[in-house]
Swiss-Prot record:
Its EC number is 2.7.1.33. This is Pantothenate kinase. It comes from Enterococcus faecalis (strain ATCC 700802 / V583). It is an enzyme of class 2 (transferase). Pathway: Cofactor biosynthesis; coenzyme A biosynthesis; CoA from (R)-pantothenate: step 1/5. Gene3D superfamilies: P-loop containing nucleotide triphosphate hydrolases (3.40.50.300). It catalyses: (R)-pantothenate + ATP = (R)-4'-phosphopantothenate + ADP + H(+). The keyword Nucleotide-binding applies. It comes from the Bacteria. It is found in: Cytoplasm.
Amino acid sequence: MDDKMNYYPISREEWHGFYHDGKAPLTEAELDNIKSVNDQISLKDVQEIYVPLTHLIHLYMKEFESLTLSKGLFLHEYVSVPPFIIGIAGSVAVGKSTTARLLQRILARTFKRRNVQLITTDGFLYPNKVLEEQGIMDRKGFPESYDMEKLINFLNEVKSGKDEIKAPVYSHSVYDVIEGEYELIQQPDILIVEGINTLQLPANQQIYVSDFFDFSIFVDADPALIEKWYLERFGALLDTAFLDPNNYYYQYAIGKREDAFAMARNVWKTVNLPNLEEYILPTRGRADIILHKTENHLIDQIYLRKY
């Protein structure tokens, strides 16, 4: 079954025509600071893709606030507007992090009085020590490697308006959750949640992460392209890791390059590709917006959910 049958397919040119105000919401220097390793994005992408997307998100936000007000009228009591949560899903190396950081910056710039924060679900991975104890270190990134109950409780606290919540922090250079290190989430008006598992429906859960989302985005591309980007990113990480013995990639950076890339290709084949095909791609049809990428991370097609 076509998982895009209930979407409006929109070309890049048509999408840009829906909303453009001629103003650049950020500078080239700010954009360079936002980009992930080896990701490619330009101010033209910001204007043609992300400015209209921000406008669409604002429409969803207004409807969300209106519904909250209506609930209060029905209940004959004041109901505060909970945080508006945006979920961003997609494969490893597809550019989710850049999309998330860019949206955070544009939303904060556009809605100056709104507190816009961002977390990644990587922080809710079980620590490596736990994965090793459970014998699932080779399944890191698969659904069972995440503490979903902890993530769901975190999102429930966010929606409930708790003053200050600790979000665990993951380090890609250490390749592990950093014990005792947290990011403070302090009553955001908008929270962006980025991760490969944000739209998944684990069989053992009665409440899903996506139940807390008010808008969701899936960053999509052909798996062969994603593999190419994954290997390019791996090479870029090796180029800096050899300077730091504490970096997870140091062991590969100081050895033979061909051996390191053979390892990376094997990880893609045995971990990332199966995870994409079995658990990530099947969630694509649950997103409100699909951003489809082609060569050089260029977004060529947008899919807007009909219903």
